[in-house]
Each structure stands twice: as C-alpha cells, then as structure tokens.
Amino acid sequence: MEKTKVVVAMSGGVDSSVTAALLLEQGFEVIGITMQIWNPGEEAESKGERTCCSLTAIDDARRVADKLGISHYVLNFRSIFEEKVIDYFTSEYLRGRTPNPCIACNRYVKFEALLDRALSIGAEYIATGHYARLGYSGEYGRYTVRRPVDRRKDQTYVLYGMTQRQIARTMMPLGNYTKGQVRKIAEDFGLPVAGKAESQEICFILDDDYRRFLREKAAGIKPGPFLNMKGEVIGRHNGIPFYTVGQRRGLGLAAGERLYVVKIDPENNAITLGPEEAVWGRSLIAADVNLILYESLEEPLEVEAQVRYNARTSPATLVPLPEGRVGVHFHTPQRSITPGQAVVFYRGDYLIGGATIESTGDFFR
C-alpha cells in the first residue's frame, strides 16, 4: 500500500526536525524541504544557528534528514519572500505602521507557495513545527485552528491568515506536546539538533537591529517633529519608521517627564508624544479580515481578543463594519493598540480569525 506523502518544512531547528520524525514514525512518506527565502550573506555564518537561512541551518536540516533516512531538498522561495515579506515590512514602517512579518510569511509563503509546490510533486499535505492544533469540527462544519497543549509556545496568533484549504492540507503534530517533550523526543531519536537553541524572532534581521535594516532597504526616511498632545513642537525625531506606538525608550528627548509615542502621522512626518495614560484605549478598527471558525460575521460577537503576539487575550465585542472591516471594543482598556499589528480573536481554544489594525477610536457606542 502506497504511503501518504507529506512535505515537512525543515528549518534545521528542533521543532521542524521532530515534526519530521513523528510523521515518519506514524507511517507517512516524509520529504524534507528547506525554504531558501533570504540571502543573509557571510554575516549569517558568524551567527551560526540563529538564522534560518544560513548554510549552517541548511546543513542541520540535511543532517536530520540523513539521520531519519528521508529525502531533503533546498528550494528557492526568495522572490515571493522579497515581495510578500521584505517589501511589506519596509513599506509598512514607512507608512508609520508596525508590521508582523511572521504573519505575512505564513500567509503567503509557507501555507500558500510551499503548499502549492508540495501538491505539485504529489504530496497530500505539508507539515510545520508550529505549536497549534489543526482539525475539523463537526459542530462548526469548518476546519479549525486551536491553541496548543503548551500555552507558553502558542503560535496561533500568527496563523490567523490560514484558509480552509490550507488548514485541510496542513499538519502540525507539535500542538499536542510541550516544548520539553519535543526536546526529549529529539534526544530519543538521536537527532543532531536536539540541543539547538531557539531561532531569533525576525529571521532576516540577523543583528535584531530593524532600524539598521530599514536604513539600508528604504529610501526617503527623514527627520521630523515630535509634538505634544496640544500639537506643539517639542523636539525632532529621526524618521517615523524608527518608532512604534507605546515606545518610551530611545526617543532621544529630554522632557523632564516620561513620554510615550501616542500617534504616528506619516502624512505630516510627525510623531505625537504624551503620558502613559494616552497610549491606552478600548476600541479599534481593523481591515483585511480572515475568519477561520465562521464563514462570515453577520452580527456582533463576544470574543477574547489579542492585539500583540505576547499579549494576553481580553474580553471584547467584535462588530462587523462596512467595506469588510471589523470593529473591536474591549471591555477593559488595552495598552498600545498599534496600527499594522494584528488583532486576533478566540472563542475558548478555537481561533476565530484576525485582521490588521487600521486605527483606534470610539466607533462603538
């Protein structure tokens, strides 16, 4: 009997390596693919295992594949990564917004471009090392994404863009394990990456200095005015891409009081600063909505909502608005609701969906 073929996205890290091992143990025909999505150059080799696209990472993935006895290939996805992730990342900062590149990569590269490539070579599924639980719910009549067993490793926030087709064709076996269990499995299989450290947050910025990256990639960054809450000029900023809502440190301004970034105005190249209470808000409007648990949103819905990757969820009312937008009104104030970031909605363990924050404001009365 022919085995079901699964393509595993192998980064050379522990999670994707254990994903491949578990699926192989379960009887699948596993093919490892490492996605070459960014050319980090020679600098990456000095960073070793911290970057996903270095020769070290590719070699680690190959060594794991050899240990498991599976095929392994390196495929070039640089063009679509440049377009959908790098260009998006820089353009959003130039617009005074704070992007989330992992969401864009998952949405357009891993679960679209890689899935299409996998299906074209006869695979029925792709698999990744994300910590989430995928399945089908008879109650909802939908393919679903649920929070993982290990809540500390929960990655559902960056998966809200997945479609029904993508969820149906994707496996995430680590959703049922804790990180400690995953490392133990890696040791039990004798995988050469069992003790490897976690990868960095933004894979294409090797030194974690996104300001340096933007200076090199983006043209037209200019200094401009810092304004107080009355609209008066109180200083100069170095360029709006270098700041984000809620930021206090690194403003370079001696004001005699603690000031925070309250608003970024790209049209006037201005940044408004104010006291901490000014960065708290209850309501937001979001666009580019993707729903997983429901086909559509016809009426207000009580949800748990999350405005940043590491933030806690908070009770909120989700409201459909014209032109495909949604409004979110939190029951309690939230800190630093930031345009460009994602707001993601949950019902219990189930991921309802998410959207991109456009603005804050009291739309909800």
UniProtKB/Swiss-Prot annotation:
EC number: 2.8.1.13
Annotated binding of ATP, by residue: 9-16, 35, 129
GO terms of biological process kind: tRNA wobble position uridine thiolation
GO MF, one annotated term: ATP binding
Catalytic reaction equation(s): S-sulfanyl-L-cysteinyl-[protein] + uridine(34) in tRNA + AH2 + ATP = 2-thiouridine(34) in tRNA + L-cysteinyl-[protein] + A + AMP + diphosphate + H(+)
Gene3D superfamilies assigned: Adenine nucleotide alpha hydrolases-like domains, HUPs, Translation factors
Family matches, as InterPro entries: MnmA-like, MnmA-like_C, MnmA-like_central, MnmA-like_central_sf, Rossmann-like_a/b/a_fold
Name used for this protein in its record: tRNA-specific 2-thiouridylase MnmA
Organism, scientific name: Pelotomaculum thermopropionicum (strain DSM 13744 / JCM 10971 / SI)
